Amino acid sequence: MKNTFELIDKPTFFGAIALLLTIVFPLILFPAQGADWIAVAKTFMTDQLGFLYLTLGLAACAFMVYVVFSDMGQIKLGEADEEPEFKTASWAAMLFCGGIGASILYWGCIEWAYYYQSPPFQLEPGSEEAVRWAATYGLFHWGPIAWSIYLIPAIPIAYFFYVRKQPVLKISSALMPVLGEHRSKGVPGKIVDILFIFGLLGGAATTLGLAAPLITEGLNHLFGLPKNNLTQAMVLLVCTAIFAYSSYAGLEKGIKILSNINFWGAMGLLTFVLIAGPTIFMLETGLDSIGRLLSNFFVMATWAEPFGGYGTFENTHFPQDWTIFYWAWWLVFAPSMGLFVARISRGRTIKQMVSGSIFFGSLGCFLFFMILGNYGLSLQLSGELDVVAILNAEGATKAIFSMLAQLPMSTLVIAVFTLLCIIFTATTFDSISYILASVVQNNVTEEPMRWNRMFWAFTLSFLPTILMFLGGLSTLQTAAIVGGLPLLVISVMLMISAVRATSLDLRHQDTYIEPTINIEELPDMDPWSAEGMALAQFEKEKDAAQEAAELERVAYTELAAVKKEIRAYVLEQGSQMETHELPENLQQALEQAESNLSATQAKKIELSEQAQNARIMFNQVVADLPLA
């Protein structure tokens, strides 16, 4: 343990734990006050800063389009002759199951019901237009923008890990072209990584907050187990045991196998519901929803309800409660998902990673909403089951299983659905614990150390379990979203970082004929590296010193000209004179020239010393570099 613990990035490891405890203990000791403060912060974030999240969503989409159609997208993540580490089916299953979790089972079934009774655009609840938008908005919130936000960190992280061969999986390392090596490895970089871990732990608590009641409801239907905190704690314990073992086994034997089981199980469930339910209705409604989404994509992506509360405009708070909150939610999970996507995409081009993630991720989410969601909508519209009434009276989990109970062989369907909830939760937390272990480890050329993965696996379940019993889980969920606010700036920096790094390296490559670009020649010195920044500083100081020397020469010339003018005046007068006997204009010119010369000489000496110190610093940085 002693030797392996030396690989741990201790400031990040202990800093993240300290920040988490600093937030959690006040929530435990003062739950009401903590909840009020977090609620105020969340309202400020969504109401006053919501336009920033909407802008980021569009910027993320635009950036992914740029990546796909630029030379950056053709860069291969790995060696020139390297095949993808995972087959496409396994890769798609891993990124979908690892990035979505049981949340898709929850919201895929019931999200439409919230839109149905509280629709966007000031529509009448339960109206025909409300029905159409209820079937559409889920696709929007879980579609290309969500996956584009997920992928912002994935590009620079994958590039630095597989192309530049940096054995770390950290957000701070991916920011090196923007922050510089010194800041990236220093305090600013540690703060970025700590904030990421805190946001991820809080976000994970939210996922468990959805999954545990959902699984408990399923067990209640199947076995009559009571729906209380103790049962939910037992559920979390089972999920923890599954993903702890999977995390211990690693990517190939753990996450990959669980994801494949989950993927095919989910496809089987969706196929059965599609066949057993109102097939034509689900297909036609799904197709109509896709068309409505495409026709109104930019309207939905930019709508912030700006006129709400003015005149006759009603302030429904829909975009703040749903779209903006969703974008903030995806942003909190983006670093972890980006790290995970980067880790499993070896052997693919950046274009394949980006386009594949958006396509398979959006497609998977669309299928859940188009089949499970539209099945519930059909029950509501046909009068077979008042899903909305059950939702309002008994909660979302009861409404979901009441829907499933209407299917043929409902007991088997509920059993499969509950099992999928367990495995979805396990795969999500498996990938999160893997990423957390990677972030706090200084070298991950292979896989994070097993004890490190196990530590985070149990931390992920222990924290939500305690807060669930104490009633502070929902507050932590909101706190994580609020705490992710700095990620708005970090996301922009990550996009800039990706462009800077790839552009620099592409300039060092020969002309390519093949569509895939293999980065073979790297610059001798990166401008953001310690030696690159030291050299740039030396060049800057040297230029300043040379400019000061030139100003000194100009000052000498000006003084000589004044003295020449004085000599001419004295000769003209035909007698010797003291300085104070000269005309006032000549006295002032002489004093000004001498003062100017003195100032430029002092400045030259100062800047020359700074240039010399910068040169010494550069030599020291180069001397401290490890031998290749």
Label the predicted regions:
Residues 1-6, 30-45, 64-84, 134-142, ...:
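Membrane-water interface regions at transmembrane-helix termini and the short interhelical loops
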Residues 544-590, 611, 618:
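Extended alpha-helical coiled-coil "stalk/arm" regions
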Residues 2-4, 36-42, 69-88, 113-137, ...:
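Flexible loop linkers connecting adjacent transmembrane helices
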Residues 4-28, 61-66, 100-104, 141-213, ...:
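Helix-loop-helix module between adjacent transmembrane segments
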Residues 107-119, 161, 165, 273-296, ...:
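Extracellular/periplasmic helix-exit of transmembrane alpha-helices
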Residues 5-21, 180-190, 225-244, 248, ...:
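Loop-to-transmembrane helix boundary motifs in multi-pass membrane proteins
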Residues 295-316, 375-411:
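Membrane-interface interhelical connector segments
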Residues 1-130, 271, 496-502:
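N-terminal alpha-helical transmembrane segments of multi-pass membrane transport
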